[in-house]
């Protein structure tokens, strides 16, 4: 009986600690969301590193993101994606091709895409506060893990956020894939509230003469 009571006590203690950790994670993430949504626009430069754990290969690409509400322009290597929140244009420079698609509401709300990359944690995830780490430059980083609530519908099982505590900004996101492939988004520069004209988020065929336009809507 004594051993049983000790076991129950440990279970309850672990539950209480877990609840406190989750509460701390929620507080940090709520602050990040509030700060991010206060910006009128975001201009960011970043890297995307793909790590294949099976064959131990790594590749990195550099990109730029302009974000304004649900509208965005993403540039990665020879590909540009423009979205006005209703329609998206994918420009494939190597193929001289433009693909037009509708932006699905479900993806806007719950998927990981450029329009919500800094607020992806708001819906569909359980969170866990892991630790704080002090960097050599004096900055304090907070590490939080996200677990999809419906893991069957995701191709990853965990997302690890690294947050600058003082700036309340996400500096990196690591997506741990079910297939053994991890993706790391690392923010290299972050500028907010600059003037961004609406024309940035609409495809202009004059900028891409001779490109084949394929409407997939």
Task: Please state what every model-predicted region is.
Residues 5, 16-57, 70, 207-217:
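N-terminal leader/targeting segments and the immediate start of mature chains
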Residues 39-43, 60-62, 69, 83, ...:
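Extracytoplasmic
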Residues 43-47, 73, 89, 143-145, ...:
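Soluble periplasmic/extracytoplasmic beta-strand elements of cell-envelope proteins
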Residues 47-53, 75, 91, 147-149, ...:
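A generic structural motif
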Residues 62-111, 183-184:
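An acidic-aromatic
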Residues 103-141:
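Flexible, surface-exposed loop/linker segments and immediately adjacent secondary-structure boundaries
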Residues 125-209, 216:
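Gly/Pro-enriched, hydrophobic low-complexity segments
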């Amino acid at each position: 009986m004594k051993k049983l009571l000790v076991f129950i006590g440990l279970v309850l203690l672990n539950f209480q600690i877990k609840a406190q950790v989750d509460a701390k994670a929620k507080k940090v993430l709520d602050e990040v969301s509030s700060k991010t949504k206060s910006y009128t626009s975001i201009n960011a430069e970043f890297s995307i590193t793909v790590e294949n754990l099976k064959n131990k290969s790594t590749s990195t690409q550099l990109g730029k993101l302009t974000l304004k509400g649900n509208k965005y322009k993403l540039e990665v290597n020879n590909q540009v994606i423009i979205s006005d929140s209703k329609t998206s244009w994918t420009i494939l420079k190597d193929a001289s091709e433009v693909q037009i698609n509708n932006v699905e509401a479900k993806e806007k709300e719950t998927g990981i895409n450029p329009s919500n990359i800094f607020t992806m944690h708001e819906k569909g995830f359980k969170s866990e506060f892991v630790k704080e780490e002090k960097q050599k430059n004096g900055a304090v980083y907070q590490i939080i893990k996200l677990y999809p609530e419906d893991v069957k519908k995701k191709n990853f099982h965990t997302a690890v956020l690294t947050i600058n505590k003082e700036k309340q900004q996400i500096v990196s996101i690591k997506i741990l894939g079910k297939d053994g492939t991890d993706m790391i988004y690392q923010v290299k520069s972050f500028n907010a509230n600059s003037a961004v004209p609406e024309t940035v988020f609409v495809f202009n065929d004059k900028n891409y003469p001779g490109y084949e336009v394929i409407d997939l809507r």
